[in-house]
Amino acid sequence: MLCAINHNETDRINAIYSQRGYDNDPEYSDINPVYLHRMHSVERATLAALKNVGFHTKLADLKVLDFGCGNARWFGRWIAWGATPANLTGVDVRAKAIEMASDKFPQCIFQTMIPRHIPFANESFDIVFQNVVFSSILDSDLRHETAAEMVRVLKPNGVILWCDFIFNNPNNPNVKAVKRLDIKNLFPDVEELLMKRIILAPPIAKILVPLSWLAAEFTESCFPFLRTHVFAVLRKRELNSSTSLKEAI
C-alpha cells in the first residue's frame, strides 16, 4: 500500500509539472521580471536569515540540501553566495528535473527521491531549504512524514529555511496552502526562530512590476497583508535555549 501511495504521488507530481512545462517555461525564470521580483523577496529573507544565524561567513564549509530542487534554479544563487558546489545537494521526485539539474551543475550532488524518504543519513546537512514544495503535497500524512525526514537529515543547530504560500489558489486544485499553524504542527520539536510574510500577491505583482519595480517594492514593503507567502527559519537544537532573529529580516 505504501509503495502504491508513493508511486501515485510521484506520478501525479510528474504529470502536473510535465503538463505545465515548468522546467523550460520562461515565466518561471529570471528573465520574467515578475518572477524575478518574487525571487528577490526570497533572496533577501534567505540572506538575512543566514547572517542572523551566523552562517553567512561559513557557507563554503556548510552542507546544503535543496528539498524539491527541481532543475536547480537556486543552485547558482547558493554558489554566488559562497557555497561550495560539492557541498550542495538537491533531491526531487521528478527524474527529468534531476537530470537537467545534473547537467547544469555537474559538481553538485543530485538524487531522485521517493515521497516519505530523503536518501541520506541522519544529521547530514547544516541547511535544508524548501521553496514552494510542501504546497504541492496534498496528503496530510505525507506532509508530516516528509517534514520528519527533513528534521532527520538536519544536523543539530542546523536550520530549515522555508518558503511557501499561505493562501489557496482557487484556479489551481493541484496545490494546497501551508498556513502558519500548519508549519508549527509539521515541526513540533524544532525551534522557531522566525516566521514572517513575504512576496507581494502575484495578481498585484503582475500589474505593478511591469509598470514600476519601485511601486511593487513599496507596496510589498508597506502593506504586509498583501504578502502571500511565509518565510520561516526553524532550528534543530539539543540545548534548551531560545533565540529570536532580528526584526530586520
What are the language-model segments listed below?
Residues R116-V128:
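A short acidic, Gly/Pro-enriched loop at the edge of an enzyme's catalytic core
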Residues I127-D141:
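A short SAM/SAH-binding and catalytic strip from SAM-dependent methyltransferases
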Residues N157-D164:
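Conserved beta-strand signature within the Rossmann-like core of class I S-adenosyl-L-methionine
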Residues V175-E191:
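Short alpha-helix
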